[in-house]
């Protein structure tokens, strides 16, 4: 449980022809006018957008256009896919990318599956005596290493803001996607500089240990206790808190806030939180 960075520098994109084609196509997408019908969706569902500088607003809009064009959105459980669903999810996903240099628009991600409400997964198992008991588990979202993100539209729209709440499911699952870019989620995404991994492991490892101890003792915490599950979940939960409760995180966990600020290149305690 040490936020291992092993494999983080093994990610390579060496097909130059495909890379050149993608770059040209993305540049064309970014140069297109942002659809007029999408802007009210941003303003209505993504309050963080209004707090951004004009340059960051433009960058976010351009990134959203590429994201929506490249990723496959599928409605599940009877949900009809709409621009509102696509743009809202894309906006929160692209907020994470806003100042990450040389990002590749979540290169492993192919599809986003969206259910109308929490969806049931019949995979939870637990041992009871000599028996294995299977039970259904309701989920709001999950990120798979094979290029799929699943989430509940109801949870995307209705984001609890209290410290004990589940936060922002899009930020959470796409933090996992960033963590999974190197192939396995360890709680250490691809950081801008190799020299950053030592401090990242030290600070996030210490904060993860503190959250685990607080969760075991049932003490109140700012960070969602689900982050005590493992380092990968801690990074996702910390990301939610960084963007959603930035001022409180900076005040109560200043070193953790600083590490996330360095990674994301954003200062939401100054800009304003996403919620």
Task: Please give the residue ranges for each predicted region.
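Short, positively charged and aromatic/hydrophobic N-terminal segments
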Residues: 12-14
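Metalloprotease/metallohydrolase-associated module, dominated by Zn2+-dependent proteases
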Residues: 29, 37, 47-49, 55, ...
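Active-site recognition of the HExxH zinc-binding catalytic motif
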Residues: 165-181, 236
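N-terminal alpha-helical targeting/anchoring segments
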Residues: 17-39, 50
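Short, charged early-sequence alpha-helical segments and their helix-coil boundaries
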Residues: 74-86
């Amino acid at each position: 449980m040490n936020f291992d960075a092993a494999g983080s520098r093994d990610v390579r994109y060496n097909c130059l022809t495909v890379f050149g084609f993608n770059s040209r196509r993305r540049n064309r997408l970014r140069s297109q006018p942002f659809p007029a019908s999408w802007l009210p969706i941003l303003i209505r569902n993504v309050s963080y957008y209004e707090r951004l500088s004009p340059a960051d607003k433009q960058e976010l809009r351009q990134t959203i256009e590429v994201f929506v064009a490249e990723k496959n959105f599928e409605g599940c459980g009877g949900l009809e896919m709409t621009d509102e669903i696509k743009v809202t999810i894309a906006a929160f996903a692209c907020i994470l990318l806003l100042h990450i240099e040389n990002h590749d628009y979540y290169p492993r991600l192919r599809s986003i599956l969206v259910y109308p409400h929490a969806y049931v997964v019949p995979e939870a198992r637990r041992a009871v005596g000599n028996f294995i008991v299977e039970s259904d588990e309701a989920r709001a979202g999950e990120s798979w290493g094979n290029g799929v993100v699943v989430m509940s539209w109801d949870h995307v729209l209705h984001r609890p803001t209290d410290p004990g709440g589940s936060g922002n499911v899009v930020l959470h699952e796409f933090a996992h996607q960033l963590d999974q870019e190197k192939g396995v989620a360890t709680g250490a995404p691809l950081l801008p500089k190799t020299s950053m991994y030592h401090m990242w492991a030290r600070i996030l490892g210490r904060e993860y240990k503190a959250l685990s101890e607080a969760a075991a003792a049932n003490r109140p915490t700012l960070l969602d206790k689900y982050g005590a599950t493992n380092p990968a979940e801690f990074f996702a939960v910390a990301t939610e808190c960084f963007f959603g409760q930035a001022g409180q995180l900076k005040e109560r966990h200043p070193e953790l806030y600083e590490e996330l600020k360095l990674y994301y290149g954003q200062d939401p305690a100054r800009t304003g939180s996403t919620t």
